[in-house]
Amino acid sequence: MKYFVVLVVLALILAITVGPSDAVFIDILDKMENAIHKAAQAGIGIAKPIEKMILPK
């Protein structure tokens, strides 16, 4: 997680210094972040029912 935050900060610095013409890198990072977020949500969605089967209340 720390590496991703560092990568995002560096990408923001790059976008500010070079201007919007080279800010395509930011779009790629945004798409990666959204994909990771969706994968994490899917993983949690799969893990919750399994957890409920293993640890009934």
Swiss-Prot record:
Cell compartments where the protein resides: Secreted
Entry keyword annotation includes Nucleotide-binding: no
Induction remark: In response to mating.
Superkingdom as given in the UniProt entry: Eukaryota
InterPro entries in UniProt: Cecropin
Similarity comment text for this entry: Belongs to the andropin family.
Protein's UniProt name: Andropin
Organism: Drosophila mauritiana
